[in-house]
Amino acid sequence: LLSALGYNAIRLYTEDTYEVEGEPYFGYLRGRYSGAELKEMDAYAAARGIELIPCIQTLAHLGTIFRYAEYAPIRDIEDILLVGEERTYRLIDNMFRSLAENFTSRLVNIGMDEAFWLGRGKYQTINGAEKSESIMKRHLERVLEIAAKYGFTCEMWGDMFMRAAYGEVYEHTYDHAEEVKKKVPGNVRLICWDYYHTCLLYTSP
């Protein structure tokens, strides 16, 4: 149907719901896609002229992995990975290795949205207080290095950088766009998503 409608790409959103080699508790009992299933979906899409693009999470939205002691050392707070901990980057490397094996696309969305409490848990205990924006940027640079190692080009959700510039809920004027652009590495594309401006407060003249 999507092919008939003219679509040439589709994004498959996952959190811990895909199989990662070397990480048996990642997606354990969560109905995760196996590598074989991902390859089958990828081939099915490709046969119809559609690129299947993985959307993963490399910072937040990973709360269910922290049910297991294996991942306790890399939990910052809530559903957020501990930035700067090498085990965090081994996990992310394993993620990308699995993506490279199971997808033909070399475009990936690395997530990184809604990490509201970034740096306020174990990270702060270890390193002291630091602005989340600087933690975010440092983590992003590491993730981009890993992605490049496997030949991936990255896009990500832009809300964390936008919130840093605009406040708790960023404005629709985008008058800080250049400021945001300067803070983001040139080899990643920000995608703006917005649940907020559908409410009366932001639609009224």
Regions found by a protein language model. Give the residues of each.
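Conserved small/polar residues in nucleotide/adenosyl-binding loops
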Residues: Y202-P205
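Short beta->alpha connector loops
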Residues: D194-T198
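Feature activates predominantly on carbohydrate-active enzymes
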Residues: L1-E155
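Substrate-binding cleft/loops of secretory-pathway carbohydrate-active enzymes
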Residues: E155-M156, M160-W193
